[in-house]
Amino acid sequence: MSDLVKTALSLVPMVVEQTNRGERAYDIFSRLLKERIIFINGPVEDSMAMLVCAQLLFLEAENPKKEISLYINSPGGVVTSGMAIYDTMQFIRPPISTLCMGQAASMGSLLLTAGAKGHRFSLPNARIMVHQPSGGFQGQASDIERHAQDIIRMKRHLNEIYVQHTGQDYEIIENTLDRDHFMTAEEAKMFGLIDDVIQYRAETKKEEKD
């Protein structure tokens, strides 16, 4: 484990709860998981995807009907890792609410728009970026050709996913994703990537009565 990772882990705050059996300490992310909140933070890669998928499956096993909240602040990353999270989101039974805080770029934007219809949000100062997949290859010419064919096939498949979740025509998605395309939260809403931009958390009925 790198020194940077060790330092980051040591900075995760702990929270203490009073229970019938006395005090119990949780790291902040474990405590939020009890509230069915999962974070996608940083680059999307295999280790992070494994943890996110495991949390999704655990929360489904705990309650297959109760909503799960996915908070996203990610520059994107590995397509296959992102697709593992995406497929798990579609596979499990609980509805999933997504919220962008900071940024949702590349695969992060796909996971943002993959939330349940009507439950895809962004904070007002977040930014969303969409683009086509990229990759670099080396080796024999025939191998490079096969990799190129695969990435073109992957590009089409990702375009179809954006079409499904945004309601845009395929040609619009293809043209928009041709280069890095940055959007404000409001622009992402107009494009169909999200359903609403929220600045303040709505009060619950219990809070209103109090």
From Swiss-Prot:
* Compartments (UniProt record): Cytoplasm
A GO BP term here is: protein quality control for misfolded or incompletely synthesized proteins
| Cited CDD domains | S14_ClpP_2 (cd07017)
- UniProt cross-references to HAMAP family, sorted A to Z: ClpP
The UniProt function text for this chain reads: Cleaves peptides in various proteins in a process that requires ATP hydrolysis. Has a chymotrypsin-like activity. Plays a major role in the degradation of misfolded proteins.
The family database entries (Gene3D superfamilies) matched by this protein are listed as:
2-enoyl-CoA Hydratase, Chain A, domain 1
Q: Does the keyword field hold Hydrolase?
A: yes
Task: Give Gene Ontology CC terms.
Answer: cytoplasm; endopeptidase Clp complex
Q: Which cysteines are disulphide-bonded?
A: none
Catalytic reactions on record: Hydrolysis of proteins to small peptides in the presence of ATP and magnesium. alpha-casein is the usual test substrate. In the absence of ATP, only oligopeptides shorter than five residues are hydrolyzed (such as succinyl-Leu-Tyr-|-NHMec, and Leu-Tyr-Leu-|-Tyr-Trp, in which cleavage of the -Tyr-|-Leu- and -Tyr-|-Trp bonds also occurs)
Keywords assigned = Cytoplasm, Hydrolase, Protease, Serine protease
Q: What is this protein called?
A: ATP-dependent Clp protease proteolytic subunit
Q: Which domain of life is it from?
A: Bacteria
The organism is: Bartonella bacilliformis (strain ATCC 35685 / KC583 / Herrer 020/F12,63)
Q: Share what the entry says about its subunit structure, partners included.
A: Fourteen ClpP subunits assemble into 2 heptameric rings which stack back to back to give a disk-like structure with a central cavity, resembling the structure of eukaryotic proteasomes.
**Which residues constitute the catalytic centre?**
106 (nucleophile), 131
**Family the UniProt entry places it in:** Belongs to the peptidase S14 family.
Question: Which is an annotated GO molecular function term of this record?
Answer: serine-type endopeptidase activity
Give a yes or no for keyword Protease in this entry.
yes
User: Record's Pfam families?
Assistant: CLP_protease (PF00574)
* Classification lineage: Bacteria, Pseudomonadati, Pseudomonadota, Alphaproteobacteria, Hyphomicrobiales
Which EC number(s) are documented for this chain?
Answer: 3.4.21.92
SUPFAM superfamilies in UniProt: ClpP/crotonase
